[in-house]
Amino acid sequence: NLHSVFYHGTVEWRCFESTLHAGEVRADITLALAVSAQAINLEKTVARKTPVGDNPAFAFRTFLLRLGLIGPEYKNVRMHLLKRLPGDPAWLRDRNQYESYQRRHTRGDAR
């Protein structure tokens, strides 16, 4: 909302749905803070659209990692933000297409 920027010097985030679930509220606040911190700390940006591809969950997970939401302290945040997206957040394509995954599971050496 640019009105609040010009008159109050603040930023408003109006893109989150109302919820009373504490984990979802924390995830939304953490996402807003991470995006704001990245916007403040970047020296330059390039405005171009990046295709999401066939797996939006993987694309959003890598975006969250670029924001710095890495580690066990952000595991719950990532879980809440990714739970409604289609696709596998851990694999870009179907995991059965990867040779290393197939070798591990054909030997019976599942981890």
What does each of the following model-derived ranges do?
Residues N1-R111:
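C-terminal accessory/tail domains of diverse enzymes
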